[in-house]
Curated annotation (Swiss-Prot):
Swiss-Prot/TrEMBL catalytic activity: a plastoquinone + NADH + (n+1) H(+)(in) = a plastoquinol + NAD(+) + n H(+)(out); a plastoquinone + NADPH + (n+1) H(+)(in) = a plastoquinol + NADP(+) + n H(+)(out)
Cellular compartments annotated: Plastid, Chloroplast thylakoid membrane
Protein name (Swiss-Prot/TrEMBL): NAD(P)H-quinone oxidoreductase subunit H, chloroplastic
Superkingdom in the source lineage: Eukaryota
Amino acid sequence: MKRPVTGKDLMIVNMGPHHPSMHGVLRLIVTLDGEDVVDCEPILGYLHRGMEKIAENRAIIQYLPYVTRWDYLATMFTEAITVNGPEQLGNIQVPKRASYIRVIMLELSRIASHLLWLGPFMADIGAQTPFFYIFREREFVYDLFEAATGMRMMHNFFRIGGIAADLPYGWIDKCLDFCDYFLTEVIEYQKLITRNPIFLERVEGVGIIGGEEAINWGLSGPMLRASGIPWDLRKVDRYESYDEFEWEIQWQKQGDSLARYLVRLSEMTESIKIIQQALEGLPGGPYENLESRGFDRKRNPEWNDFEYRFISKKPSPTFELSKQELYVRVEAPKGELGIFIIGDQSGFPWRWKIRPPGFINLQILPELVKRMKLADIMTILGSIDIIMGEVDR
């Protein structure tokens, strides 16, 4: 980082990696002129675990539990992208019931992620009270996850060709009750937060990003939609069964922190609409395509013989990836989550490249905070919505 040549004494401040407003182990080296930010340099890598290299040394079935550690607050999306790639490579058809259940789980995960963004974001800018209301609703979502998957976080629920298990008895009614209840709570958030003059003073006109600038920086998700670009991969790519439901892309024109807040708040309402339609139209049939278990059993065939069944540990079955390249993407809560896969006719991917939305959205932070006040760093960083497990991988 080059120190600006001025006649003033500048102060260099280290924020993080343990600062509570960093949302993980992010470190910012901030150069200050009084209260004004002159420069900002993010330091990444504190949570790097080599997720891409791990993927290249594991079968897809073995790697599924790992992917929930990318964005550990929206794990359904990392699972979806991990199984969607092999499904497209192998031309595997997902049963309609499994696709609907996937949509329900993805939208519940989107709501949980936005709630977990909103609570700490409000706490960062000094509003502690909404934090407790918001986490109350988040616990209801986690109760639904626990009933369906057995886990409140790190669900490991998606499988190649379907899902791990069908919905338990009474779960649909419980989820519909939550949808009705949550819509009233969103109205309460609007009364408590959106109309609060102190909140508006902190976020309105702070961290403005224009539409063309957002595209040039490669931003996605609420960061892009808050800048006047109505781009949502659920409408563009029509993956899973999203084209069978009626919902609208939520976007704003202002491009500031308030616009990003409004986009995420209205997205939760749209997610409830999608969940209600999916629950009411949930078809019957299987929840998994059993033909997808065309596993690669040709290795060491002698160990599958009758004589060895009691004395040998059989190798776990693997899904064979055909020799081709593929880029798959989904609309995660933070933006476009994608993976680039290269198969080489084996159970392991030859290359597994992750496109994390948080990492790419974080690039614009130094540009946004320059010439702003020190206190605005919390507002701008919070409005970007990052999780360092996904940024560092």
